[in-house]
Design a protein with these regions (language model features):
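Conserved amphipathic alpha-helical interaction elements at protein-protein interfaces in regulatory
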Residues: 26, 49, 86, 99-103, ...
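Conserved active-site alpha-helix within GNAT-family acetyltransferase domains
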Residues: 91, 103, 115-133, 138-141
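Conserved GNAT acetyl-CoA-binding A-motif
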Residues: 101-112
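Acetyl-CoA-dependent GNAT
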Residues: 3, 7-77, 81-83, 94-95, ...
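Loop/helix-junction capping segments adjacent to catalytic residues or to phosphate/diphosphate-binding pockets
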Residues: 14, 87, 118
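Conserved acetyl-CoA-binding loop-helix of GNAT-fold acetyltransferases
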Residues: 80, 86-99, 122, 126
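A generic structural signal for beta-strand entry/edge sites
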Residues: 70-72, 108, 142
Length: 149
């Protein structure tokens, strides 16, 4: 097993889409790359930075930062395969994104999530994220949070 976190490149697209096709149904939604998830076809244009956790070249996790406004970064696409959960890899992905946002000079990071994502919520809380009012138009999100640096 050779696990690393690397910046996204087009060469990872098929593996990423395969991972999302397996991962998304487990969290209650299908992966729809030709529908509501079409933006994943244009990762470099849609995200400021995007990372993949790969195990022997196969994508097993992801996280991204998107510029929300001049002072605010938005954390997106935090997903990790079931088999790697509970081993610190989710925290490593999260650290990668939060460190990047801090290094880029953002004053805060926001995110949206679902109430059912209990493990993710524990991670957010452990970093000091606090609940805020709805800040975006994501009709699927139930929880909105921010971390102020």
């Amino acid at each position: 097993m050779s696990i690393s976190i690397i910046p996204y490149s087009e060469s990872l697209k098929d593996s990423l889409f395969g991972f999302y096709s397996e991962c998304f149904p487990g969290i209650g939604k299908p992966f729809e790359p030709d529908g509501r998830h079409n933006f994943y076809n244009h990762i470099p244009e849609h995200f400021e930075s995007f990372w993949c956790l790969v195990d022997d070249g196969i994508v097993k996790g992801s996280v991204a930062i998107r510029r929300f406004n001049e002072d605010t970064a938005e954390l997106k696409a935090l997903y990790l395969s079931e088999e790697l959960r509970g081993q610190g890899y989710g925290r490593k992905l999260f650290d990668t994104a939060i460190s990047y946002a801090r290094e880029q000079g953002y004053a805060r990071v926001v995110l949206d999530s679902m109430k059912s994502y209990v493990n993710a919520r524990r991670l957010y809380d452990s970093y000091g994220f606090k609940e805020i009012e709805n800040y975006n138009d994501n009709t699927f999100a139930e929880v909105f949070m921010e971390l102020v640096f």
